[in-house]
Design a protein with these regions (language model features):
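Positively charged n-region of N-terminal signal peptides that target proteins for export
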Residues: 1-5
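Bacterial N-terminal signal peptides
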Residues: 6-16
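Extracellular/lumen-exposed scaffold segments
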Residues: 18-151
């Protein structure tokens, strides 16, 4: 009975840590000049002991990380996906390209001269699959909204 409780606790902790990734984002300076561009970034923070498959994991079974950005009335360039790190895991014969720690996905937003309004709102959806060295969890989507003042 005691080992069953231990197994349950380990399972719960694994599920909690698999959902421990945070996604944030910002536009440099918090504003964009009307008729101009500004740089921004989506940031994925991955807790220790976990990794997520990169945008190009080099494995047909690994689900790649994706970032989708959208915003009404603006043009978005990017994001740019950084290179991951090749790692060898017990569950795979070949190396898999992964992200660990803090990963930045830079982008550029351009606000046209005729933009109506004083605030830009960007929607970002990050899809990733978190894994330990032994097992991968189901993929998740995290959505955030980034706002910036239009000057």
């Amino acid at each position: 009975m005691r080992s069953l409780g231990y197994l349950f606790a380990v399972l719960i902790l694994g599920i909690i840590s698999a959902h421990g990734q945070t996604v944030s984002g910002s536009i440099t300076g918090g504003s964009v000049v009307r008729g101009g561009s500004a740089k921004g970034a989506i940031v994925l923070s991955i807790p220790g002991g976990l990794h997520v498959n990169s945008s190009r994991p080099a494995s047909e079974y690994a689900i790649p990380t994706t970032v989708r950005l959208s915003g009404a009335g603006v043009r978005i360039s990017g994001p740019t996906f950084p290179r991951g790190v090749n790692r060898k895991f017990q569950f795979s014969e070949n190396t898999i390209n992964v992200y660990e720690g803090t990963v930045r996905f830079p982008f550029t937003v351009t606000v046209p001269t005729g933009f109506k309004g004083d605030t830009v709102r960007l929607r970002a959806v990050v899809r990733y699959q978190a894994c330990t060295d032994e097992v991968c969890y189901p993929p998740r989507n995290k959505e955030i909204t980034i706002t910036a003042r239009v000057r």
